[in-house]
Amino acid sequence: MNLCSSAGATASTSSLSSSGHVESNSSGPSEAIHCFGVVGGGGNSGGSGRADTALNQSNRSTVNGGGGNPTNSNGPNLTHNEINAIMPPETRPKMVTVKHPESNKPKPTTKKIVKNIQADQDVIKALQRCRDEGIKRLDLSKSSITVLPNTVRECVHLTELYLYSNKIGQLPTEIGCLVNLRNLALNENSLTSLPESLKHCTQLKVLDLRHNKLAEIPSVIYRLRSLTTLYLRFNRITAVADDLRQLVNLTMLSLRENKIKELGSAIGALVNLTTLDVSHNHLEHLPDDIGNCVNLSALDLQHNELLDIPDSIGNLKSLVRLGLRYNRLNSVPISLKNCKSMDEFNVEGNGITQLPDGMLASLSALTTITLSRNQFTSYPTGGPAQFTNVYSINLEHNRIDKIPYGIFSRAKGLTKLNMKENMLTALPLDVGTWVNMVELNLATNALQKLPDDIMNLQNLEILILSNNMLKKIPNTIGNLRKLRILDLEENRIEVLPHEIGLLHELQRLILQTNQITMLPRSIGHLSNLTHLSVSENNLQFLPEEIGSLESLENLYINQNPGLEKLPFELALCQNLKYLNIDKCPLGTIPPEIQAGGPSLVLQWLKMHSPYRQM
């Protein structure tokens, strides 16, 4: 049987009628099945023929498909009983009750049926046009397709076929007739397998099977040796067969988000790979053969269960990105220092205590280093040279108790440092040399003092010092004129310096959970401030100048047990959207007004303000 023949395997043909129904013409006998009987030839040679004769003799009455009475074209309608009365028992048509097995299930709405029919018609028309016009690119994505018509075999000119985001559970065998196909997108369907006929698509370069229901890599894929790009992300694949080695032309392979426990030695045969993504699987080890993939520039291994990395990884001298986040590594091999093209090194979420001596210094192209959520107790060895070209360092959530003096002396491009959740008690004496720093996160440490030299960090835009042991902020903070976010939450601060008012670019000031008794009047100069949190302090009053904060949108002053009244000037904050005054003994404002939200409180303040005539 030639599945790719336009005439098909039988003599019947299908066409779309003007009413939207598919009309079938067949050279064989036909049988019409009705709800109340069987009419026409093709049945047994007994009663059916005689019944037809009897019906013809009875004014040629016919049985309609809707279950109504037989119709006499030349006279009145006859009931079934009347028909039976004029017919011998042996020639009477048998009563047939047709009941679908799922007839008890809720029936789809007419609207849904019409929509599906229309979708099917659109697909058929698209395939016909593709055949008639020799179209090379066909996009049937998001078309609610459940079954791809076998007439797809006629679209032999196709080089690109997009079927993503449908409801296809199985491809027709005729897909193999598309011998010119180069790009086939089947992502976001319900495929559990692929037909063997796909092997005839010998020119296929790109195959996208993301987000399907494949429990294994279909064996036919291994026969598509022209493939350069294969996406198998988010399926249910548990293993990779040794036949993978046949796909020697692959440059991109994605097996992300499956259930793969082992990557066999066959991976080493894919010497043309430039991108390999096996993240979010269950790998515990990598084969040594990974070192044969010398053209790899991106290797993503994050979110696995890797216990070690083979030394052969040092052979990947073209590697630019290596993702090792969230595994079970205790160390990395020193051979990584040979991967001198790497610009990002990320081992977040492992159990690493130290890196090999001088490894980072050897990776001179690094711009981003992420060592967060490990077991480091000190900075990596290698001195200032290891951060020469780095602009971002993340050591969050480790056990580091100090930043070595001069460690960033060569890091002229360092703009972002995250030391959150460590054990720092002080900053190094040369902190004033970090002049290019833009974002500095020192939250959740044990800092007791902020050095005056902080004034030199004049490019700083984000300074996070929350959850430390600071008692005061130096006056030199006013020199940080570019500061947009200042987070001092959960310290022991009692007084803010007057110079805080010089931070005209400040948008968020977080002072929650301190021991502040009053805000400086200069706070009114913070014209760009949108968020001010002073909750859980010891405020006795708010300065009148708070009314000058024309950009203020959120104000948290809750849980200040000594705050008994609000200044009338607060009503001047026209952009205020959220006001939290819970657990403040505001005796002057009625409870029902307080419960009404910020707009009602502001309205009350305005009505009772001496400025109400203004």
From Swiss-Prot:
Q: What does this protein do?
A: Acts as a Ras effector and participates in MAPK pathway activation. Probably acts as a regulatory subunit of protein phosphatase that specifically dephosphorylates Raf kinase and stimulate Raf activity at specialized signaling complexes upon Ras activation.
Coiled-coil region(s) at which residues? none
What family is it from?
Answer: Belongs to the SHOC2 family.
Q: Give the SMART domains listed for this entry.
A: LRR_BAC, LRR_SD22, LRR_TYP
Residue numbers spanned by region Disordered? 1-29, 44-79
Where is it found, in Gene Ontology cellular component terms? cytoplasm
Alphabetical list of Pfam families matching this protein = LRR_1 (PF00560), LRR_14 (PF23598), LRR_8 (PF13855)
Name the species this protein comes from: Drosophila virilis
Q: Does the keyword Repeat apply?
A: yes
User: Quick one: a GO biological-process term for this protein?
Assistant: cyclic-GMP-AMP transmembrane import across plasma membrane
Disulfide-linked positions: none
Q: Where do the LRR repeats start and stop?
A: 134-155, 157-178, 180-201, 203-224, 226-247, 249-270, 272-293, 295-316, 318-340, 341-362, 365-386, 389-410, 413-434, 436-457, 459-480, 482-503, 505-526, 528-549, 551-573, 575-596
InterPro entries associated with the record = Leu-rich_rpt (IPR001611), Leu-rich_rpt_typical-subtyp (IPR003591), LRR-SigEffector_domain (IPR050715), LRR_dom_sf (IPR032675), LRR_R13L4/SHOC2-like (IPR055414)
- Provide this UniProt record's keywords sorted from A to Z: Leucine-rich repeat, Repeat
Q: Quick check: keyword Transit peptide in the entry? A: no
Name of the protein this chain belongs to: Leucine-rich repeat protein soc-2 homolog
Q: Matching Gene3D superfamilies, A to Z?
A: Ribonuclease Inhibitor
